[in-house]
Amino acid sequence: MAKIDVHHHFYPQAMREALERAGGDPSGWYIPPWTLDLDKEISRVLKVQTTILSVTAPGPGIETDPGKAAALARLCNEEAAAIRDAHPLQYGFFASVPSLFDTAAVLAEIEHAFTNLHADGVTLYTRYGAGHSYLGDERFRPIWAELSKRRAVVFIHPTHAVDTQLINSWMPQPMFDYPHETGRTAMDLLTRGVIRDYPGCKIILSHAGGTLPYLIHRAATMLPFMPRNLGMSREEIVEAARTFYFDTAISANPVTLKALLEFAKPGHVLFGSDFPNAPRGAITHFTSFLEGYDNMSEETRRLVEREAALELFPRLRGQSTRACL
């Protein structure tokens, strides 16, 4: 089946140059090679028909000057739109935005990206600023309100933790720490009421939701008994967590995939590769495991590989139908 890949990065030249000026990715990850030819080649190998491009962390915020960060987001979005326009059956994109603390600049870029460039959604990172300002932060509510009004698809990608020290020199943060950051921001969104208050957003969590599916029952069972509680039962908290969408990037293994499929709502699990940031051997390994996984129905497989994404990105439905004829 021709897949739709919702977790797939690209490196505009301006982004690569900004990372090099900053001394590299603060997470400790290397900057991988990327070209459109390499991108198309991996899509053929993975049997991907349509890729939704995104700029991975740290994104435009690598520029600490607000004006430069906004300009970098604009350059990334213009380049992504040009790729999509040249190959509309093969590509879409999630728009980049500057730091969420720059509310006016973020709202301006959302307006440009959705109205003028027809972005398929927007990328947000798990936290912003020098502290633990996860995505439920009250200061980010005007942005959530705008995205909910637009019924936007929001792709949440982890970024480095406040503490950038590595476990050891073999373990850059994306390898082990990133899923914790995804779980933390998901719980922040749940406990601060963002999920409840802005239901128009369709939120994709990277890497099978990080630690959320594994730990949600632990937190949801304790929260109702805490002095400061949410006024929600355990069941209501768990059900709120199930409103997220989840991608399979670097996560299709016997333990994680089984747990994710049991936890997520039908149609809320989407294929993702994490190209080019994950090593190619890891990408093909996890994809092969997903393709050979026999503990899911054919209906579920169709949803994961393609059909669930078509519900989120309806513009692809007519195009993909014609392309498959």
Curated annotation (Swiss-Prot):
It comes from the Eukaryota. Its EC number is 4.1.1.52. It catalyses: 6-methylsalicylate + H(+) = 3-methylphenol + CO2. Pathway: Mycotoxin biosynthesis; patulin biosynthesis. It is found in: Cytoplasm, Cytosol. One of its GO terms (cellular component) is cytosol. Patulin was originally used as an antibiotic and specifically trialed to be used against the common cold, but it is no longer used for that purpose since it has been shown to induce immunological, neurological and gastrointestinal effects. Genotoxic effects of patulin with dose-dependent increase in DNA strand breaks in brain, liver and kidneys have been detected in mice. However, more recently, it has been proposed that patulin might also have anti-tumor properties. One of its GO terms (biological process) is patulin biosynthetic process. PANTHER family: 2-AMINO-3-CARBOXYLMUCONATE-6-SEMIALDEHYDE DECARBOXYLASE, AMIDOHYDROLASE-RELATED DOMAIN-CONTAINING PROTEIN. Monomer. Belongs to the metallo-dependent hydrolases superfamily. ACMSD family. This is 6-methylsalicylic acid decarboxylase. It comes from Aspergillus clavatus (strain ATCC 1007 / CBS 513.65 / DSM 816 / NCTC 3887 / NRRL 1 / QM 1276 / 107). The gene is patG.
